[in-house]
A protein has these predicted regions:
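Structural preference for solvent-exposed beta-strand-turn elements
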Residues: 1-374
């Protein structure tokens, strides 16, 4: 293999796969990228055996072929050069020569035929989804995935098809046992995708899918053989689904009381900023904030005996009974940051019930935060 490629093009391609590469794997090949030179095209592939990604970039091909190279080393070389083009050539006995008109690198590599092959399931049914919808659904659920290794059943986003009033929707749900985030979106042709009773997408796979969605253009999306497959242009990502049963989350969501005295109307930004200030004196031992809700006010009190306390009151629209509860401010921050509404609604049935969060500009979204003892 022998190529010349624009530095910016190579940097874009190599940067794109860094999140997939395994840094401490017992399989060294998983820390490499596969470079495949075709006629005027360079394919860059990466995998950790759970996620596979491939995209193509324009290149001046001198000789076609394939090589592997450390993804980190190639990224560092590309970042540090001040040359507009980089020359890469395969040498004998698994060596690679790289030149940028200033420095010359001779690097060892692994045989290209040892790189795990990225295979797209055959005869897969795919539908087109707007990228902005994919991004919104991921951003409004991914933060609720558990960070605990023991919580395997919760370590991804659950995706299923639902029917509301005769129309088909795609639903994503995530929970860590202390909070839940859910979003429904109407997707044309979603009925063509076979999800059985729903599927679990791992957090790392969602992050990579989100990167693909944030680029221009719509996404082709499909499921087959325990894999999620997505395409955009020449980019392909294959994500292995989690083999886990998601908990019965529907029983956790209380029925919202629609009477106005139980609904708290509040500006999202002041609440978000106040919750951030509550975090200033937070510690692992003192994580909660006391929330007092009265007629037209919401008061937050955070106390840490080792540091001090912080107290703040903000205006709201509320005409119900006094409510005193405790919450983890981090959970409010994550939910509020993901939302777009200027005005949001908090629905609390009683002092032992979860807090439901919705907003008019966040169509189909529901946030749920469990109370805690403070």
């Amino acid at each position: 293999m022998e190529i010349k490629i624009d530095t910016e093009t190579l940097l874009k391609g190599i940067s794109r796969v860094q999140g997939i590469l395994e840094k401490r794997s017992q399989m060294p090949i998983l820390s490499t990228v596969l470079l495949t030179a075709k006629e005027n095209e360079l394919e860059i592939s990466a995998t950790d055996l759970e996620i596979g990604f491939q995209d193509s970039y324009p290149v001046e091909t001198i000789e076609q072929g394939s090589i592997t190279i450390s993804g980190k080393n190639l990224l560092d070389i590309t970042r540090e050069t001040n040359s507009r083009k980089i020359y890469i050539s395969e040498k004998e006995n698994n060596w690679i020569y790289i030149s940028d008109n200033n420095a010359q690198y001779n690097l060892s590599c692994l045989p290209a035929d040892e790189f795990p092959v990225l295979t797209e399931p055959k005869d897969i049914v795919m539908i087109e989804i707007e990228s902005k919808i994919v991004t919104e659904m991921i951003n409004k659920t991914i933060y609720s995935i558990t960070m605990e290794e023991a919580g395997f059943k919760l370590s991804g986003v659950f995706m299923e098809k639902i029917n509301k009033d005769g129309e088909n929707f795609l639903r994503m749900v995530a929970t860590d046992g202390h909070r839940l985030s859910l979003i429904d979106k109407k997707i044309p042709d979603i009925q063509k995708i076979d999800m059985k009773q729903g599927v679990m997408i791992p957090k790392k796979g969602l992050s990579e899918l989100n990167k693909l969605a944030m680029e221009n253009g719509n996404i082709l999306f499909g499921l087959k053989q325990n894999n999620l497959v997505a395409r955009k242009g020449k980019a392909l990502i294959v994500i292995r689904l989690l083999d886990a049963k998601f908990p019965d989350y529907k029983n956790v969501i209380p029925t919202k009381k629609e009477d106005k005295e139980n609904i708290i109307t509040i500006n999202r930004r002041p609440l978000l900023e106040a919750m951030r200030r509550m975090m200033i004196i937070r510690s692992d031992q003192y994580q909660g904030v006391k929330v007092n809700i009265g007629v037209d006010y919401l008061e937050m009190v955070s106390i840490n005996p080792n540091l001090g306390n912080v107290d703040e009151k903000i205006e709201i629209k509320y005409d119900g009974e006094l409510i005193e509860m405790g919450f983890n401010p981090r959970y409010f921050i994550d939910a509020l940051q993901s939302m777009d509404s200027d005005i949001i609604y908090l629905n609390i049935n009683d002092q032992t019930s979860p807090c439901l969060i919705t907003g008019d500009q966040d169509v189909g979204f529901l946030g749920l935060i469990m109370p805690m003892r403070v």
